Every structure is written in structure tokens, then in C-alpha cells.
């Protein structure tokens, strides 16, 4: 059934006013008596019914208008002006003209408000002083707000709002309190989607509130009344909180008997509309039978419009009066909405859709376009309000009815296209229809009956016990778990009904076959969807215009379901296309300008920069030529954007914005209205699309200059099906295909753009929301641990201590009730957010991103055009699957899981150091993702499975010098590859931290050691092969170790001085954190040195290499410095460790000493004797070497100096022997052999050492004799100092002259040469 009727064209004009001749001719179609009976049956008076046939005059279309006018006469006793007890305009709105302090954003209709300051206050334009009154507040966010009443004399500010002054009264559902100068507990907690009714009884002087129609009881009594006392509805909101008021402009959702809305309903129009609706319903249920000459009663669901002139003329007379009424908000919601909902509730979905479809046909047929458009707009806004602010009931019946009606309306093609073009994304947020809100009060939602038995997982609270405490499940626990799971399944099935309806609605919006009268729905949706994404991508700092993330999560899942349906449907009819499992975004979409990415960052930087630097590659690889003149104009346009003249900027602003809203700050100032309450902010168009002329060469062959045809990319708002899907000469979105891309089509181009937008949605806010919802599960685990600890205490508590038993029993009850509540909420969260189906959606997006990145990488330099969010979504979606969905569902069961892990590993390994990626944030994200990846055994094995050349390239990038780049994460990756192989390096947590409260065991740093011998071997091979790889890498590691440990020592000196002051003082927590970080960096750098010297000892010990001796001397110097600082008893390090300051938990003797010991053992207790002797001589030659530091490792006290006091006998000494669980007996034996070797070698060195003249010592280190002279300046030092200096700087240490060469210098030879010359 189309809006044209049964192949006949009817218009409202044809049937509203007709000539007498026409009426006579039409009347003759049926008998006069039958027509009169029919019209009396349709237009019967509600008061007197249908008059008897003998007492009435015949009714026909000639005298019908008079009859209808008489039928619609209403005695309007209700005054539309002033009513006793009320002062102010009859149309009640928020007073945005001033009289209060605070900053607020007020919607166009002056009924919605968003807090935009610390605590802004606003009141209504009308007050009451007598009688019983009520208004409703629709809660859009559940934060800090105080809602109630105030008088005109109340003065508010940014700290004090409604309820904080005399004669102002408020209810605060966020803190569950009532306010009137003082505060007490009152009511229940509210949530987003609730409706608060505010009632004031000025006859009795009482004030009360209702939440979703349920009374919360009397809040205040003995209100001040009398002369000058009138009360205004008022609200105070904190920043970002939002509500909408209903003073009576729409039917109250929860009317209260005896209480009157502040704004009177349109009584006369309401009666007329109800009578006209009754006439319309009668038309649907009564049929003319001309053959039998009688009226036939039938079900309205069976009614069909057959083009009967009598029926059409009758409907024309009805709509002549009905159409103007259907433009009014109140009447649409009270009359039309109720009628349509009744149809949906009574019939089957198919019957309801058929009837609604025909009703919409009639609306378009008999009403003017502007009338039906206003009607549909109000209808959808009412539907959205009803859906959004409906309470959750056990069977979700309310939500199902509203969604079924929404779907029935959208099935009507003409209505759907109008709503898509003008309403769904412009006037209201259609994403609300795809949201299923989470109930805050599980009892009211019926979850207690749906899930009568609760259960929660029992997890061990101590890490390191490896599940030793994990008891087997008892029979009772197993029965509880199964009963809980059955309840969860019942809940999930009910939620799936709602989700399926939401998917069906989206399928209607994505229909691309309804192009009979204009553009198909999908292409309208694409334009609006892109603007929606632009608003949320560009409005990060403007919270009011952003779509709430919880809505985005639901919208994304429904969009993925609808998208995959259409994708696979296209594959079924086009065998050459791809299945949705193989979906990806072709790389040309990122650089051909056909899709708007707003101002989002690209991997290679700014789009304007990429277009200039890569224009040759675009021409050679993608056949896209950018006009230099247009490019220059676009660049200058971007530069001058902020310097445009004021009038032009103002005109542009007005052209881009919807109607303004009021800025409530003592006066009415224009401000862009917040998108969530009204229309979106469009923002500026992409400069690439609007100004850059792009030349496109469509054939895949080399073209001459003459064949290059210049065309301009179409703006997003102007695109048609041909612009997107293409034609025989135009590839549409896929214009500029690179040679690496296959020619076969993936799917319809429009679906590619929907997929691209879906990936962008995930990056905008979905991932953060998925992480936020994990908090419910965390709360369950915390309360479960608290309950178990309480039950353990109850079992241990002596029965004679009844006071303790009573307190423990009370705590047990509190924890049990809280767990019952949380476990039911968790069931809801798992069903709506973390279900298996939702996990598959996120996994599919991960695979889409991986394939998109792989295809983009093949384009070479054009990969830089890819938006950054593709890489971030690949990283974040994997993190979500592992950390958010993993505890509920097993990742190993995902299809192709191992292959996906390997592909992601290859991407991280290749691109973390990719020069085509310039953004600091995305490079850091890639580095952190790779660092996390190598911490878990299954993902580390995936790294080992990538091709060998990629593994070697990754390790080569890890071994690049640390200077001029972020190196901490790189070093941490190398440490993780070594952890489990180093000396005493098999711990998960440090030994001294095991007894403290555990952290999250899922953290990467708390995973069990899983070293990679394969990657270690690659590292060893690279360090051996490259002549300059090892020196530059180790020089940078030694430099960073010197810096990190020096910073650490400097900071603990400041901390120690602050701790020793007598006056009260505080140490900055940030300083403690930086101090601990420097210590951790020092330990990790030492571990990298240990790994290097273990894998490739010849780098330090093969002195045939030019840098080996220098590196060994530097290493020995640093090791001795660390040992001296850490091992001296009662020194700075010892005292700070003893303080055990919060934030310095990781600072301890063990981690840094075992790292140093591992290096020393490898140098002195392994390898041939020649290498050992070389290492020993270098170590002993360092002036900072002290044998007591080595003895300290085994707990041996240093010899007492003459006259020194004996150490305290109860002092606990550090010793590696005390860590038998962490250090093996073989390792301890190696330390003992090392100590014996050094003891003997130091004794020999002491006997052989000769005194040295101070003038002959190196002026840089004052430790070694001068042995080198710099040319041409002639300054001198020891070889070790100048070699180390030249690793980083070529200027002279003393005079800054450039050093050309370094020559050996011998004092005796120099002296003799001088004497000879003399």
C-alpha cells in the first residue's frame, strides 16, 4: 500500500470542499439511507449516542459540515488565563532572563537544561501560592542535583542552590537526601531515565516527591504561606548534569489525583481531538455493504482502504478538523500516541504494522505536508521520551511496545525518509532507541523474581599461591550457580527480544532498495550518521554535545548486527563479493577524499601536510593528482581560518548552527544549543573535500597528461547513490584504487562507509565505557572477599564474645544483601554488555582493523593517510576482549583466535617503530601494546610465530640507541624477554611485597616470567653481526643507567632530609613516584646489561674489538657506584628503605643487588680464565671498588676499623642466602666462588700497586694516570675518560675545540723528548 492509495491519486483539496453537484453525484454511489446511517454511525455524539432513525433528519455530505461543527462544540470552562493560586504566564517555561547566578545551557523550548558550572540554579517563569500543584522532571543524568521549590527572595550562588536557603526545599536523589538549610535522609536513589514528580500542597503546607510514580512520602511540612509567599519550581545542577521539565505542556507521565499541573492542558482541543479520533476509529471498524444495504462491523486490524469515494469523503471531513490539532505536542502524545500504542498492544506485530502503515498513508493523503511533518516530528519525539524514561519492568513490555510502534512508523517509506532527513538525527537522538538502560534498583526491575537465587565467583585474594586455596565446588554452591545461570539465561532471552527489535529498526534505516521517490534510506542515513560522528569527534571538549557513551555501546552492537546482515545478503546475490568475516576498509578511502574524516589525526600527521609531501605518490600509485593552486588556496584558507573578519565569521556561524539557546547568566545571550537536547553542531566541512580539486584517472593504465580529467570531490551533504556506489565509469568511494588492491568488489560501497563509521564510534567512547562497566564485577569481587573474611572471623570468634559476634553478624548481613543486589546487576551487565554475542562483535571489529591495516601497509607511503583510530581500535579492542570479556568468556573459543593473535603481533612488531607513523600518542600506544603483549605467554608465543624477518626487524628496532627517542618502554620489553633467565630473576612480585595487599593480578607487570629464548637469540645475533650496533646500544644503556641511578640517589637524599626534620612535613607523592620510577629503571637497565653480557660476553671481554675495553671499564665503574651506594650499612639507601614510605614499596635491596650480582657472576665466574682475569683487573683497577660490597651480598660483616663500635646484635643483615626460594644453590655457589676469587685478586693487586704522583692523574676522573693527548688542542686525560667522552661528543672536554685525533701519551717518553729538544 503506497501513499497514493489503490492506484488512485487523492489529495486533501479534492475532499475537503466539494461542489453540490459533485456531492450529489458521489452520494448516488450508495443509498441515501445507507449513507445517512453510515455518517450518523461515524459522527455520533458522545453524549447522546446515535439518534433513532425515525427521529433524525437524513445526513449527507451536504449537511455534514454543520453536523461535525455541532459535534465538536465544547464548553471551555477552563480559563486559559490566570487561575486562582497561580501567577505568571499560562505557558510555563524556565526563566532564562536572569535573576539567578550560575552558568546553564537551556534548550530551545526552555524546558531542558544542562549544568555548565559548579552549581547553577534556574527557576520557572510561573509561581503558585494556593492549591495543589505538580510538575515532573525527567532525569537525563544521575549526578548531583537538587530539585524542588523556592521563593522569589531566595538568592543562590555557585556554592548554594535550591534547598540551601530559607524558603527553598529540594530533593537530592544522588545523595538520597532532602534539603532545607539542613539535610536529612529521604527517598531513594535516582538514575538516568527516572521521572521525579514534585508536589506542593499549599492548602496543608506540605511538600512531597514521587519517583517514577511511587510516593517517597512527605518531605516538608509547615511551609511558609501568606502575603508575598509564592513558590517557583527550581533546580540546581552541577557541571554536565541534565534534565528536562514537564510543567504540563505534555501529558504528565504520572499524574497525581487532586494535584494540578502548573500549565493547563488544552482542554477544548483535547476533547475535540478525542471525538475526532473516535470518528476515525469508527471508520476503521465499520464497513459499507452497498449490495446488502447495511453496515458491517469488523475488527479495525482488518481494515483496508479500497479507494471507496464515500469512505474517502468521510475521512476528508474528519481530517479537515483533525489535521490542525495533530500539530500540537500535547494532543499528539495524549491522543494519537495512545491510539497507535493501543493498536500495537492488541494485535500481532504484522497486523499492527499493516494498520499503522495505512494510517500513515491517510495522514499523508489528507493532511498538508507541513502538518503531517509536524505531526510525525512530535510523534517520534514523544516515542523517544516514552522509551527513554520508561521504568524497567520484568518482561520489558513497555520498551517492546514503544519499539514495535517505532518500527511500524519507520516501515512506512515516505515517513521514514522524512524522519531520517529531518528528525531522527537533527531534532532528536535516534541512538536512544538502541539503548537498553541498566536498572539501578533491581527490585523494581523485577530481577529479584527473575533471578531468585544469587551467586558470585569465589576468587583467591592472594597472588602467588597458584590456586592452592581454590577449593572444589560444593554441591550447594554448584546448585546455586546453576540456578543463577538459569536466571541469567531467562533475563538474556528477554533482553534479546528488545535487541532484535532495535536491529530491525536499523535494518529499515539501512535499506537501499526504497529509492522509488528520491534517495534510498541508506544514503540519507549515511549523511546523518557522518554528521553525528563529526559532532562527537569534534566536540570532545564540549561535553553537552556528546552522545553518552553508554548509548554508543548499544548503538555500535546493533549497527554491527545490521551491517553484517546486509553485507552477507549482498554476498548471497554477488558471488564475487566477500563475506562479512573478510571485511576491511580499502586503503583508497583514506586518501581519495570521498569520506570525511573531519580533523582527526592521520598516521602521517596533518592531512594538508600529507597532500603536499605525498602528492607524487598519489599520482603514481593511485592516479590522483592534486592541483597545486587549489592546494595552496586550501592551505592558506586553513591558516587564515581564525583571522576571518567578524561579520563573515558571524554569518558562517549562523549558517552552520541550529537555532540558538539561552545562556543563563543574568541575561539571554546566544550560544550553540547542546546537541544532546536538540540538534547537532555541524562544525566546519573537511577542507580536503570542499576546497582541494582532485584529478582522477580511472583506468588502471599509464595515462598521458591530456587524459587526466580534473573533477572536484563532492561534499558529504551533496552525495547521491552514484557518488557512493559509483557507476560504469566511476568507482564511487573506491576511486583511486592502488595496484596492490584486488579488483573484485568487497561489498556495496555504502556498507564500507557504515563500517568505517562503526570503527570510529568504537574509538570515540565505546572502549572507555566497556572498561567502566567492569566496575560492577570488581565490586562483586571486593564484597565477596569481604564476606568470606567476615565468615572466617565468625568461625574463629569465641562464643563468649557476644558483642563481637553481633557486629560480625551484622556485617555479614550487610555484605550478603549487597552481594545479592550486585550479582543481579552483574547479570544485567553481562547480558547487555559482556555477552558472547557482544564479544563476537568486538572481535569482528578487531579483525576488520587488522585486515585494514595490512592492506593499507601494502600501499607503502600512502599508509600515512590512514586515520590513527584504526590502530588504536585494533589495540583497544584486543585489550577489551582480554580484560573485559575474558573473565566471562574464554577468548580461546573465538574462531581463528590464534591466527588473529599472530596478525596483531605482526602489526605491533612492524609499526611500533614505523617512520611513516609520526604521532607521539599513537607511537606510545603501539609501544605500550607491544610491551603488554610480551608479558603473557599466549601472546608472546604469537610474537614468536610471526615471520623471521619481521622478528629480526623488531629486535633491531629494540636495539636502536636510546637517545633521541622514548626508551623506557623499549627497555621494559627487553627485560620481559629476559625475565625468568636472569640471576634470581624468577619472581612475579618482589619477595618483600608478598605479604602486603595484592594488586590486580591481570596487570602485565604481575605476570609470571615467560622468557623468549628465540628473541634472545635474535638479539645475540644482531649484536654480534653489526660492528656498530653493540657499541651504540650499550653506550646508550650505560648513559641511561648513569642518569637514572644518579637521579634516584639525588631524590632519596631530599626525601631523607625531609624525613629527618623535626617540624611536621609532607613528602610530595609525585616525588615519591618519580623516585620509585628511577629505581625501577635502574634495575631494568641492569637486567638488560645482564642479558647482553650473558648472551654476547665477547662484546665486553674480547679486547680485540675496539670498544670492548672501554665498555667494560664503564660497566665496572657503574657497578661499583651502585654497590657502594646500596651496600653501605646505615647509609642513605638503607635508611630510606627502612622508612617504607608509601609509593616507594618497590625500593629494596634485593632487586638491584641481584641484578648487579648477575652481571658480576657472568663476568667473573664463567668463561675462560683469560677473560675472567681481564674482567677482574678492570674491576679492581676502578678506584671505587670495595671488597666489602661483595662480602655484603652474602651477609658477611666488614672488618671493624680501630675504635669503631660493635654493630647491634639484633640488626638483621641482608644476605642472598636468605632468599632460598628465589636464588638456587648453584647460583649461591657461584657468588661464593666469585667472592673467593676477588678476595685473592684484590690482595695480589694491593701488594703490587705503586704510589702515583697526583700531577700524573687524569684531571677528569682523578683515578687513572694520564695516558692520552688530544689533537690539536693538546689537553690530556686517561684513555678511558676520553673514549667515553667521544662516544657522545667530539669537542674537547676542557676547551671545546673539535678533537681531530687522540694519541697515546707516556710521561717518560715526553720528558726525554723535551730534554733532547732542549
Curated annotation (Swiss-Prot):
Modified-residue entries (Asymmetric dimethylarginine), positions: 687
Organism: Rattus norvegicus (Rat)
EC number: 2.3.2.27
Positions contributing to Zn(2+) 1 binding: 1258, 1261, 1278, 1281
Keywords on record: Cytoplasm, Metal-binding, Methylation, Phosphoprotein, Transferase, Ubl conjugation, Ubl conjugation pathway, Zinc, Zinc-finger
Sequence positions that bind Zn(2+) 2: 1273, 1275, 1292, 1295
Residue span of region Interaction with NFKB1: 972-978
Skewed-composition ranges (Basic and acidic residues): 460-481
GO molecular function ontology, one term from the record: ubiquitin protein ligase activity
Annotated B30.2/SPRY domain residues: 72-252
PTM description: Ubiquitinated, leading to its degradation. Deubiquitinated by USP19, thereby stimulating CDKN1B ubiquitin-dependent degradation.
Region (Disordered): 459-481
Pathway: Protein modification; protein ubiquitination
Name assigned to this protein: E3 ubiquitin-protein ligase RNF123
EC category name: transferase
Subunit structure of this chain's protein: Component of the KPC complex composed of RNF123/KPC1 and UBAC1/KPC2. Interacts with UBAC1 and CDKN1B via its N-terminal domain. Interacts with RIGI (via N-terminus) and IFIH1 (via N-terminus).
GO BP terms in the entry: protein maturation; protein polyubiquitination; proteolysis involved in protein catabolic process; ubiquitin-dependent protein catabolic process
Superkingdom field: Eukaryota
CDD domains: RING-HC_RNF123, SPRY_RNF123
Subcellular location: Cytoplasm
Zn finger residue spans: RING-type: 1258-1296
Positions of post-translational Phosphoserine modification: 679
Reactions performed catalytically: S-ubiquitinyl-[E2 ubiquitin-conjugating enzyme]-L-cysteine + [acceptor protein]-L-lysine = [E2 ubiquitin-conjugating enzyme]-L-cysteine + N(6)-ubiquitinyl-[acceptor protein]-L-lysine
Cellular component terms per the entry's GO annotation: cytoplasm
InterPro entries named among the record's database cross-references: B30.2/SPRY, B30.2/SPRY_sf, ConA-like_dom_sf, RNF123/RSPRY1-like, SPRY_dom, SPRY_RNF123, Znf_RING, Znf_RING/FYVE/PHD
Amino acid at each position: 500500500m503506497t501513499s497514493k492509495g489503490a492506484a488512485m491519486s487523492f489529495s486533501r483539496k479534492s475532499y475537503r470542499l466539494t461542489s453540490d453537484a459533485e456531492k450529489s453525484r458521489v452520494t448516488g454511489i450508495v443509498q441515501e439511507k445507507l449513507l445517512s446511517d453510515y455518517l450518523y454511525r461515524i459522527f455520533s455524539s458522545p453524549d447522546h449516542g446515535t439518534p433513532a432513525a425515525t427521529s433524525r433528519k437524513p445526513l449527507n455530505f451536504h449537511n455534514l459540515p454543520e453536523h461535525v461543527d455541532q459535534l465538536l462544540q465544547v464548553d471551555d470552562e477552563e480559563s486559559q488565563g490566570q487561575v486562582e493560586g497561580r501567577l505568571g504566564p499560562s505557558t510555563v517555561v524556565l526563566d532564562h532572563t536572569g535573576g539567578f547566578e550560575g552558568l546553564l545551557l537551556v534548550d530551545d523550548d526552555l524546558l531542558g537544561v544542562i549544568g555548565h558550572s559548579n552549581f547553577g540554579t534556574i527557576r520557572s517563569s510561573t509561581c503558585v501560592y494556593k492549591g495543589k500543584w505538580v510538575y515532573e522532571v525527567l532525569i537525563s543524568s544521575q549526578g548531583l542535583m537538587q530539585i524542588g521549590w523556592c521563593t522569589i527572595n531566595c538568592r543562590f550562588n555557585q556554592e548554594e542552590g535550591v534547598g540551601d536557603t530559607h524558603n527553598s526545599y529540594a530533593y537530592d536523589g544522588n545523595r538520597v537526601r532532602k534539603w532545607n538549610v539542613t539535610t536529612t535522609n529521604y527517598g531513594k536513589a535516582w538514575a538516568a531515565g527516572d521521572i521525579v514528580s514534585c508536589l506542593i500542597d499549599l492548602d496543608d503546607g506540605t511538600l512531597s516527591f514521587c519517583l517514577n510514580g511511587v510516593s517517597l512520602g512527605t518531605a516538608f511540612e509547615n511551609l511558609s504561606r501568606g502575603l508575598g509567599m509564592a513558590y517557583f519550581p527550581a533546580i540546581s545542577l552541577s557541571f554536565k548534569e541534565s534534565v528536562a521539565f514537564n510543567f504540563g505542556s505534555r501529558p504528565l507521565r504520572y499524574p497525581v489525583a487532586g494535584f494540578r499541573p502548573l500549565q493547563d492542558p488544552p482542554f477544548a482541543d483535547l476533547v475535540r481531538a478525542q471525538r475526532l479520533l473516535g470518528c476515525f476509529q469508527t471508520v476503521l471498524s465499520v464497513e459499507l455493504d452497498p449490495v446488502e444495504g447495511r453496515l458491517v462491523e469488523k475488527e479495525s486490524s482488518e481494515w483496508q482502504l479500497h479507494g471507496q469515494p464515500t469512505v474517502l469523503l468521510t475521512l476528508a471531513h474528519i481530517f479537515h478538523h483533525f489535521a490542525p490539532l495533530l500539530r500540537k505536542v500535547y494532543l499528539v502524545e495524549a491522543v494519537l500516541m495512545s491510539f497507535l500504542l493501543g493498536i500495537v498492544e492488541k494485535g500481532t506485530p504484522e497486523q499492527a504494522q499493516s494498520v499503522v502503515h495505512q494510517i500513515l498513508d491517510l495522514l499523508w493523503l489528507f493532511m498538508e505536508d507541513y502538518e503531517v511533518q509536524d505531526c510525525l516530528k512530535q510523534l517520534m519525539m514523544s516515542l523517544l521520551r516514552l522509551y527513554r524514561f520508561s521504568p524497567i519492568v520484568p518482561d520489558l513490555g513497555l520498551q517492546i511496545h514503544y519499539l514495535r510502534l517505532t518500527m511500524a512508523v519507520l516501515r512506512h517509506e515516505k515517513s521514514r525518509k522524512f524522519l531520517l532527513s529531518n528528525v531522527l538525527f537533527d531534532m532528536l537522538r535516534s541512538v536512544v532507541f538502541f539503548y537498553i538502560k541498566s536498572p539501578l534498583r533491581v527490585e523494581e526491575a523485577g530481577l529479584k523474581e527473575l533471578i531468585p537465587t544469587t551467586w558470585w565467583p569465589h576468587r583467591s585474594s592472594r597472588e602467588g599461591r597458584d590456586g592452592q586455596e581454590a577449593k572444589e565446588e560444593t554441591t550447594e554452591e554448584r546448585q546455586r550457580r546453576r540456578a543463577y545461570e538459569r536466571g541469567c539465561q531467562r533475563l538474556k532471552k528477554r533482553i534479546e527480544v528488545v535487541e532484535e527489535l532495535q536491529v530491525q529498526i536499523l535494518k529499515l534505516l539501512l535499506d537501499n532498495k526504497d529509492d522509488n521517490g528520491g534517495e534510498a534510506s541508506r544514503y540519507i542515513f549515511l549523511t546523518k550518521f557522518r554528521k553525528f560522528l563529526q559532532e562527537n569527534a569534534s566536540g570532545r571538549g564540549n561535553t553537552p554535545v556528546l552522545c553518552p557513551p553508554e548509548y554508543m555501546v548499544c548503538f555500535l552492537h546493533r549497527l554491527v548486527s545490521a551491517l553484517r546482515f546486509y553485507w552477507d545478503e549482498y554476498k548471497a546475490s554477488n558471488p564475487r563479493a566477500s563475506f562479512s568475516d573478510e571485511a576491511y576498509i580499502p586503503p583508497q578511502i583514506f586518501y581519495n577524499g570521498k569520506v570525511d574524516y573531519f580533523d582527526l589525526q592521520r598516521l602521517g600527521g596533518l592531512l594538508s601536510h600529507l597532500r603536499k609531501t605525498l602528492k607524487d605518490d598519489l599520482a603514481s600509485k593511485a592516479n590522483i593528482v592534486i592541483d597545486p593552486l587549489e592546494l595552496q588556496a586550501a592551505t592558506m584558507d586553513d591558516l587564515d581560518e581564525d583571522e576571518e573578519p567578524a561579520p563573515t565569521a558571524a554569518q558562517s556561524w549562523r549558517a552552520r548552527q541550529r537555532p540558538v539557546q539561552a545562556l543563563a547568566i543574568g541575561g539571554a545571550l546566544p550560544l550553540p544549543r547542546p546537541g544532546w537536547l536538540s540538534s547537532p553542531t555541524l562544525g566546519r566541512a573537511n577542507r580536503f573535500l570542499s576546497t582541494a580539486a582532485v584529478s582522477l584517472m580511472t583506468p588502471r593504465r599509464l595515462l598521458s597528461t591530456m587524459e587526466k580529467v580534473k573533477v572536484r570531490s563532492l561534499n558529504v551533504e551533496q552525495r547521491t547513490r552514484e557518488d557512493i556506489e559509483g557507476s560504469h565509469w566511476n568507482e564511487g568511494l573506491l576511486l583511486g584504487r592502488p595496484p596492490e588492491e584486488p579488483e573484485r568488489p568487497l561489498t556495496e560501497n555504502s556498507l564500507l562507509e557504515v563500517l568505517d563509521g562503526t570503527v570510529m564510534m568504537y574509538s570515540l567512547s565505546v572502549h572507555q565505557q566497556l572498561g567502566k562497566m567492569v566496575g560492577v564485577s570488581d565490586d562483586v569481587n571486593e564484597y565477596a572477599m569481604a564476606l568470606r573474611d567476615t565468615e572466617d572471623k565468625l568461625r574463629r570468634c569465641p562464643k563468649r564474645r557476644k558483642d563481637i559476634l553481633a557486629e560480625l553478624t551484622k556485617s555479614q548481613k550487610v555484605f550478603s544483601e549487597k552481594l545479592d543486589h550486585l550479582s543481579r546487576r552483574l547479570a544485567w551487565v553481562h547480558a547487555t554488555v559482556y555477552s558472547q554475542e557482544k564479544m563476537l562483535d568486538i572481535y569482528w571489529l578487531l579483525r576488520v582493523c587488522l585486515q585494514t591495516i595490512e592492506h593499507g601497509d601494502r600501499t607503502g607511503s600512502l599508509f600515512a593517510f590512514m586515520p590513527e583510530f584504526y590502530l588504536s581500535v585494533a589495540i583497544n579492542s584486543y585489550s577489551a576482549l582480554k580484560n573485559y570479556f575474558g573473565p566471562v568468556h574464554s577468548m580461546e573459543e573465538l574462531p581463528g583466535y590464534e591466527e588473529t593473535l599472530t596478525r596483531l603481533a605482526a602489526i605491533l612488531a612492524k609499526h611500533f617503530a614505523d617512520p611513516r607513523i609520526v604521532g607521539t600518542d599513537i607511537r606510545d600506544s603501539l609501544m605500550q601494546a607491544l610491551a603488554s603483549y610480551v608479558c603473557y605467554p599466549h601472546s608472546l608465543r604469537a610474537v614468536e610465530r610471526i615471520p623471521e624477518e619481521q622478528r629480526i626487524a623488531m629486535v633491531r628496532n629494540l636495539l636502536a640507541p636510546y637517545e633521541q627517542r622514548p626508551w623506557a618502554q623499549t627497555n621494559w620489553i627487553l627485560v620481559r624477554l629476559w625475565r625468568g633467565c636472569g640471576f634470581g630473576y624468577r619472581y612475579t612480585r618482589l619477595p618483600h611485597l608478598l605479604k602486603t595487599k595484592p594488586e590486580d593480578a591481570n596487570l602485565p607487570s604481575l605476570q609470571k616470567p615467560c622468557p623468549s629464548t628465540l628473541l634472545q637469540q635474535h638479539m645475540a645475533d644482531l649484536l654480534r653481526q653489526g660492528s656498530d650496533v653493540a657499541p651504540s646500544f650499550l653506550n646508550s644503556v650505560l648513559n641511561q643507567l648513569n642518569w637514572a641511578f644518579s637521579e634516584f640517589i639525588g631524590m632519596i637524599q631530599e626525601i631523607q632530609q625531609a624525613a629527618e626534620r623535626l617540624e611536621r612535613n609532607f613528602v610530595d607523592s609525585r616525588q615519591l613516584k618519580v623516585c620509585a620510577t628511577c629505581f625501577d629503571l635502574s634495575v631494568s637497565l641492569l637486567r638488560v646489561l645482564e642479558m647482553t653480557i650473558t648472551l654476547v660476553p665477547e662484546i665486553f671481554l674480547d679486547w680485540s674489538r675496539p670498544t670492548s675495553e672501554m665498555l667494560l671499564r664503564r660497566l665496572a665503574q657503574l657497578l661499583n657506584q651502585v654497590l657502594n651506594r646500596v651496600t653501605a650499612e646505615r647509609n642513605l639507601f638503607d635508611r630510606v628503605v627502612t622508612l617504607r614510605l608509601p609509593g616507594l614499596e618497590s625500593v629494596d635491596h634485593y632487586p638491584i643487588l641481584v641484578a648487579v650480582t648477575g652481571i658480576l657472576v657472568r663476568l667473573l665466574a664463567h668463561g675462560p680464565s683469560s677473560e675472567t682475569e681481564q674482567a677482574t683487573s678492570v674491576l679492581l683497577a676502578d678506584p671505587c671498588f670495595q671488597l666489602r660490597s661483595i662480602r655484603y651480598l652474602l651477609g658477611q660483616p666488614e672488618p671493624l676499623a680501630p675504635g669503631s663500635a660493635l654493630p647491634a646484635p639484633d640488626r638483621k643483615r641482608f644476605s642472598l642466602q636468605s632468599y632460598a626460594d628465589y636464588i638456587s644453590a648453584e647460583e649461591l655457589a657461584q657468588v661464593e666462588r666469585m667472592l673467593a676469587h676477588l678476595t685473592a685478586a684484590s690482595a695480589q693487586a694491593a701488594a703490587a700497586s705503586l704510589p702515583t704522583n697526583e700531577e700524573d692523574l687524569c684531571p677528569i676522573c682523578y683515578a687513572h694516570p694520564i695516558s692520552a693527548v688530544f689533537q690539536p688542542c693538546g689537553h690530556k686525560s686517561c684513555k678511558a675518560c676520553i673514549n667515553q667522552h667521544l662516544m657522545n661528543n667530539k669537542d674537547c672536554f676542557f676547551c671545546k675545540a673539535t678533537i681531530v685525533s687522540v694519541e697515546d701519551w707516556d710521561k717518560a717518553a715526553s720528558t726525554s723528548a723535551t730534554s733532547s729538544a732542549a
